[in-house]
């Protein structure tokens, strides 16, 4: 799909304006994503991302000089993501896939690193998705979501804009124990409004 430069620039302007809104509420999106990336390194190849969203983490991963397959069930979100990834000049490094993350079409242990950022609270069946992440992961899983302070900021911003932030019922605090149950060594990191679980499959 060809993307025009005008569309890329218009979207980038809106994205930068949105980042400033978040900063006014005390949430630095770039610092948050860089915190997650730092805890994710070194990345094991190939890389699968679960939950493309608007493509911000997708682009950051691809900017590390690696190829990324990113999965989402929303075509609309992936169209926005293409614009954001294109703005970062890494579109050729990203393959977009439209699938239900609870039923991935990939082979067992087919990916060196499986990443999911700020998507867990949106999943209808979060532990079915986590189970699929475990199945297709050969070495490392990185799964991050907002910490309590982060959620409070996001909820307030959305309320101030006249709507509620969508959150499903998954208990993110169980993720670490769940990974350990599948023989992963797990580290938990809390900072920059994020909780990040990094699980490495034991040899």
Predicted features by range, described:
Residues 19-26, 57-59, 71, 142-198:
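C-terminal alpha-helical "lid/dimerization" subdomain adjacent to the S-adenosyl-L-methionine
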Residues 46, 67, 95, 110-112:
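Structural signature of beta-strand start/N-cap positions in the alpha/beta core
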Residues 127-141:
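A short glycine-rich, Lys/Arg-flanked "PGG" loop and its adjoining helix->strand segment in the class I
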């Amino acid at each position: 799909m060809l993307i025009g430069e005008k569309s890329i620039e218009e979207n980038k302007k809106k994205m930068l304006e949105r980042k400033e809104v978040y900063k006014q509420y005390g949430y630095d999106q770039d610092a948050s994503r860089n915190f997650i990336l730092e805890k994710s390194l070194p990345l094991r190849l190939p890389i699968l991302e679960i939950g493309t969203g608007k493509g911000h983490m997708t682009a950051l991963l691809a900017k590390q000089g690696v190829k990324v397959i990113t999965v989402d069930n929303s075509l609309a979100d992936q169209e926005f993501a293409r614009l954001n990834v294109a703005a970062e000049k890494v579109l050729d490094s990203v393959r977009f896939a439209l699938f239900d993350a609870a039923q991935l079409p990939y082979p067992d242990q087919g990916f060196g690193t499986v990443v999911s950022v700020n998507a867990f609270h949106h999943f209808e069946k979060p532990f079915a998705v986590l189970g699929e992440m475990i199945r297709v992961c050969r070495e490392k899983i990185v799964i991050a979501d907002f910490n309590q302070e982060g959620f409070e900021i996001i909820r307030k911003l959305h309320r101030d804009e006249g709507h509620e932030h969508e959150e499903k019922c998954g208990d993110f605090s169980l993720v670490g124990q769940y990974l350990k149950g599948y023989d992963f060594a797990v580290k938990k990191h809390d900072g920059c409004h994020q909780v990040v679980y990094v699980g490495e499959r034991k040899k």
